[in-house]
A protein has these predicted regions:
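Conserved class I S-adenosyl-L-methionine
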Residues: 254-262
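Short beta-strand element of Class I
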Residues: 278-282
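Class I Rossmann-like S-adenosyl-L-methionine
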Residues: 1-231
Length: 459
């Protein structure tokens, strides 16, 4: 198996699901590959998913038949081939085309191979001049129907103006975002902020490593070196600064019992353990696989317990700090969660909001009098953030101690250190009158609700 053939197969499966793309594990498929080939497969698959809508639109402009009538395996090959031609400058065109054609002939027939050859060579002809990031057309790509923007701030000039005429649809296609998400953003934050968010979604999310002393740095080495670096000290972790900031809101508290209700793979659990070393911490997650990872990660940590969902009986009414990092639309972390770029719609948002409310209602009986709740999402949507917190305050007679809505930062071509995810977090209590501002080790310029860029924050 070659790295390309593995990606072809994986994208074929995804093409049946689109826009409901799955988060697939690499599993056994890439184990036989060496590090270089694994890195290539990873870059090709993630790059294709991140620009799926853009690539599909360009491919459709070269077709005489409906995209939906093409065999899923061939759709996967075409997407991967177009991604190499347009997104991976180091890959020669002939390498991208030849393996796509040969794999298709083996998988299907010579006719299908000829079809793939013709379409990918049309993509090569469609790709024109490459613009420097300082070129005005590259900087204002959304104004032009013939500009294909790239993650480094550069852009391709296409030989035909194939992007849609309508500006909002064009923005979604060029930035590879769903129409419903673009329209929702325009309706809530306006056109200018939507443009900035869309441009941010073209950038590559860096890997941020939190060192044992709490400092945060962008990792620039290989994945193998990163794995070794993390194994050397289990206090190191991968975490974006915005994600780390939410737990830092609890820094001035002295909780005896903490529950991390939706712990995922334990990123915030690790941070809670570091910030509150004397607390008893109970962590859970409804997903069996993630819960197994939690058991492995905290196997030798005495004051962290991994429990089954809803098995918190012995701490009912005794929890001092409840952490609710709830499932959400992921709209603040789309460069990291490319699968979420296309599935946003009003009905899904309503479903997520309902799920979040269910989680809140199920978990709040754990709290003792005067306890605190940390509510966090990686979403930009007010329905999942500010409106949920408003509902919590009314429904449970709670008060907001601090809240923060954070816009994502970092544009294509910017230094990786400027990048931050977007998100929201709020610390609430039913007994906030007992709290004073100086009880919290927070930034002095932080307001109760802000949209500031946490560029200089440390996790």
């Amino acid at each position: 198996m070659t790295p390309r053939s593995i990606v072809f197969q994986r994208l074929a499966r995804q093409s049946v699901r689109f826009p409901d793309l799955a988060i697939e594990s690499k599993g056994h498929e890439t184990k036989a590959l060496d590090e270089r080939d694994r890195a290539f497969a990873r870059a090709l698959e993630l790059g294709t998913i991140a620009r799926w809508r853009s690539l599909q639109h360009l491919l459709e402009s070269c077709l005489k038949r409906s995209w939906g009538n093409i065999d899923p395996a061939v759709r996967g090959v075409l997407l991967a081939g177009a991604a190499q031609i347009l997104l991976m400058e180091a890959v020669p065109d002939h390498a991208a085309v030849d393996e796509a054609v040969n794999w298709t002939k083996k998988r299907s027939n010579a006719g299908a191979g000829g079809f793939v050859n013709g379409v990918l060579r049309s993509i090569i002809r469609l790709r024109g001049e490459r613009l420097d990031r300082n070129d005005e057309r590259a900087r204002e790509w959304w104004l032009h129907r013939d500009i294909f923007p790239l993650e480094n701030g550069e852009a391709w000039v296409l030989t035909k103006a194939v992007f849609p005429e309508e500006p909002t649809v064009r923005l979604g296609v060029q930035a590879s975002l769903g129409d419903d998400l673009i329209l929702s953003w325009i309706g809530t934050v306006g056109w200018e902020t939507t443009l900035v968010r869309a441009a941010h979604c073209l950038s590559r999310a860096p890997i941020n490593v939190i060192e044992k002393d709490g400092t945060n740095a962008v990792w620039e080495g290989s994945h193998r070196a990163l794995a070794e670096h993390l194994r050397e000290d289990d206090r190191r972790r991968i975490q974006d600064r915005v994600s780390a900031m939410s737990v830092n809101l609890t820094g001035g508290l002295t909780p005896e019992v903490i529950v991390d209700f939706c712990a995922g793979r334990g990123t915030k659990t690790h941070q809670l353990h570091r910030l509150h070393p004397n607390s008893r911490i109970l962590a859970s997650d409804p997903h069996d696989g993630r819960r197994a990872e939690l058991h492995e990660a905290f196997d030798h940590v005495e004051n962290v317990e991994i429990v089954e969902p809803r098995r918190f009986g012995d701490v009912l009414g005794k929890v001092d700090l409840l952490v609710l990092d709830v499932p959400c639309s992921n709209s603040g972390v789309l460069p990291r969660r490319s699968q979420a770029r296309y599935r946003f719609n009003t009905e899904r948002l309503k479903s997520l909001v309902a799920l979040q409310k269910t989680i809140v209602e199920e978990s709040l009986p754990l709290l003792r009098e005067g306890a605190h709740v940390l509510y966090a999402t990686c979403s930009l949507e007010k329905a999942e953030n500010e409106k949920q917190v408003d509902w919590i305050t009314r429904r449970f007679d709670a008060e907001v101690v601090r809240s923060r809505a954070i816009e994502p930062a970092g544009l294509p071509g910017d230094e990786p250190s400027t990048y931050t995810d977007g998100g929201f977090h709020a610390l609430l209590t039913r007994d906030s009158a007992r709290l004073r501002d100086d009880d919290f080790s927070l930034h002095s310029n932080e307001s109760n609700s802000s949209h500031e860029n946490p560029e200089n924050s440390k996790a």
